[in-house]
Amino acid sequence: MRFSTLVSLAAWAAAALACDSCSEPGKPAEHKRLVRRMQPEALGALTKPKGPLEWGQINFLHTTDTHGWLEGHLKEQNYGADWGDYSSFVKHMRQKADRLRVDLLLIDCGDLHDGNGLSDSTSPNGVISNEIFSRVDYDLLSIGNHELYVTDVAYETFANFSKVYGERYVTSNVQIINKETGEYEYIGSKYRYFTTKHGLKVMAFGVLFDFTGNSNVSKVIKAADLVQESWFIDAVKTPKPVDLFIIFGHTPARTDDKFPTLRTLRQKIQELRPGVPIQAFGGHNHVRDFVVYDETSTALGSGRYCETLGWLSMTGINSRTFRGSMKPRGVPNPTRRAIKGNATTSTQPYQHPRKGLDLRYARRYLDWNRLTFAYHASKSQDRQFDTQKGLKITHDITDARKQLNTSTVLGCVPETYCMSCVPFEAKNNIYQLVIDMLAKVVVKEDRADKPRLLLLNTGGVRFDLVKGPFTKDDEYIVYPFKNQFQYLPDVPYSIAKELLDALNKGPYQRRSEEYSPMAPQLSTNEVCANPSPEFVQLKRREAPQPYRPITRRTIDSSMLYPGYVTSDDFGLDGDDTPHSKIPYFKVPIDIQANASFPTNGSMPTVVDLAFVDYIGAKYVIPALNKLGGKYSASDIQSYKDFGSSSFLREYALEFWQEGLPNCTTN
């Protein structure tokens, strides 16, 4: 009942956001055609997994940074499963765990929206997608920074989503002001102590990195302060038996001085309870990664955007109450000790951290598609794979997308544009397209004749753009942030012309505490595949899978198709499906367009300097002043606010109408 009500309310709100008719501005568009949607018509994966998963004493399925991608990837073959397919897979895997007499836990590390039309077409974001997400029965969940930027979203998470999961939604260092009492309280539980189905005693803490970009109704406690709090120390030192500590949350699995959260918790727990195994799960940086901390503690990171499902298995945990199988029969078992570079069963001398403790691990990164899920779910065929619950979720996703008009076609993209598969200067680089968009549609009408420079940070672009129908969904996917442009009028051109270079030599412009700009990458036959830009982390750990267009051709099953190629502390064999590597080219921090410059080739004396609001006061003003300007935030004025629309939509409605209504992908 709640889902149908939510969809109806969201559809009513979405109607106000519908685009104008392409031929008659001001008249709502009436595109009947929906682009190829997820669910049964989704593109099938080309390559099956390399072999069965290892099953241990305790096993984990791990998701993170789904960002609303519950429909799956409509145009990417390797990520074609939707949340209903995943739900069916979870049921099969839990049944398999029961047959093997082992434990299986589901863990999610937050960031549930901002990046897809299904999650971002509602107000607040996530009203529909959170309800669909919550139909999968997770054992542990944590909060992400994208749940805290906007006050309405934070309260939606607190009032509804957290209540669905109860004590399983763990927010050890995140609090919110209760509207009724005016006091801070934890959004979820502070910790969770529980016993697994087969008797393991587990203590779990769920954390967010030291985030400072939250709205003023919430509070994030720094990890260094958290571990000194009496309740945390008491929980770690509980007189109850603890066989395994789980520390998980929205923070990178691979720790450093910038993101020390998991390291801080691990070290404190080891100080108070030496010898007890610690398993960590991370997210936020959108990468596949497995990290060996020491002989009894490792961490798993499982990508982003419903592209990756992480798998981890462990064997060797000492427990007086465990009544399952340490080494289940009929399936491979974990064999690797927690030693960096341990690509095979270790034969080197090993110092047991605790008498009788010999932990063995296995990890795998699963591509998010039905072929992968069916293969690992006892090699089920499609008819056997689908569950009634999974089919209902699939149906509801399809219905919600229709009601929210996310498949409404706004234009026909003439070519495929990627973020980093080709050099920045190449015509098929998406930033060259965005530069053209800025020049043509971002204009203050009463100053249209004034020469202008327009700046945008590349981190705001989150996805590639494939040739074919451009939908409302694509609008959210490519650039999910609000489009408010500001400006400084009549800036001396002698200063303004130096600004782009100064910004690109300056600090990286993360969206508040964002780790780095990330986006799944696409390709066509004419454009090479590409990974996500990771300007800060130039030592890449993987390259995301590109979209391969719909074509009628013979598939060579022996080929390696482009996708993730991951290197982690266990080596190069973590990817469940083998892929070929993908090219990667760096991108600048900011891009610039110019418009209304003198037609005779001369340079203007002054220009209007426009920029997206995110970079204005924090980056543009300081950079201008270093170049000799004398500006303050109070000098910034509104230039153009696209409101519920976007510069992408405006561009599509004006320049991408050729080929409609029969626009096809490749």
Curated annotation (Swiss-Prot):
Keywords: Glycoprotein, Secreted, Signal. Coiled coil: none annotated. InterPro entries: 5'-Nucleotdase_C_sf, 5_nucleotidase/apyrase, Calcineurin-like_PHP_ApaH, Metallo-depent_PP-like, Nucleosidase_C, Pesterase_C1039, YHR202W_N. It holds the Pfam family NadN_nucleosid_C. Residues 1-18 form the signal peptide. Induction: Expression is up-regulated in presence of human keratinocytes. The keyword Endoplasmic reticulum does not apply. GO terms for molecular function: hydrolase activity. One of its GO terms (biological process) is nucleotide catabolic process. Residues 323-353 are annotated as: Disordered. GO terms for cellular component: cytosol; extracellular region. Glycans are attached at N160, N216, N342, N405, N594, N600, N662. It is found in: Secreted. CDD domains: MPP_YHR202W_N. This is Secreted protein ARB_01864. It comes from Arthroderma benhamiae (strain ATCC MYA-4681 / CBS 112371) (Trichophyton mentagrophytes). The lineage of its organism: Eukaryota, Fungi, Dikarya, Ascomycota, Pezizomycotina.
